[in-house]
Amino acid sequence: MATVSMRDMLKAGVHFGHQTRYWNPKMKPFIFGARNKVHIINLEKTVPMFNDALAELSKIASRKGKILFVGTKRAASEAVKDAANNCDQFFVNHRWLGGMLTNWKTVRQSIKRLKDLETQSQDGTFDKLTKKEALMRTRELDKLENSLGGIKDMGGLPDALFVIDADHEHIAIKEANNLGIPVFAVVDTNSDPDGVDYIIPGNDDAIRAVSLYLSAVATAVREGRSQDLAVQAEEGLVEAE
């Protein structure tokens, strides 16, 4: 089963929080102390909390659950996309559009438009347009791909959110809360843990730390999905590959 050790976390700098003056007092239970005016996160709390989160995400994946990775900060953007693709899940890695979950009906129409434009760009429709019209549609396609490309095949609301930086993604968390979708999130010392069902106290800026979370989650999800396939194979529903 996918797990992460304290040594892995120390090497990745998971324990380095934000400057003490930016702290959120609600994170006090997860703070070990301060060094050079920077809060140090208590990894004795983080390790079991993260491993619990991984086990639960694996369970959700084993039930064919859809997991939406959310990380729109520039530094995390590419890693979020790669991790989601790596385990055949979904992602939002540029900008969270308000209503992305709570107004799914409208989002679905935009996804339909995105798919129509993709078809047009491949079937020669764009070639028949004036240069200006083709350019306008290409721009629209790029814009839609940027914001919705990671969820265009989700086919409905996700069963869980995995969030890098609870502070930065507070709108996504609020929408998931409103819909009763469980939230798994990396919560740094400057963030509010309210609304997060599975709190992972840790550094949300260092790329090594972010990569550690993402690759562990992707592995846990893949393991969960392979359990699902193994069960189906036993029941004779699919032929084991």
Curated annotation (Swiss-Prot):
InterPro entries: Ribosomal_uS2, Ribosomal_uS2_bac/mit/plastid, Ribosomal_uS2_CS, Ribosomal_uS2_flav_dom_sf. Keywords: Ribonucleoprotein, Ribosomal protein. The keyword DNA-binding does not apply. PROSITE patterns: RIBOSOMAL_S2_1, RIBOSOMAL_S2_2. CDD domains: RPS2. GO terms for biological process: translation. This is Small ribosomal subunit protein uS2. The lineage of its organism: Bacteria, Pseudomonadati, Pseudomonadota, Gammaproteobacteria, Enterobacterales.
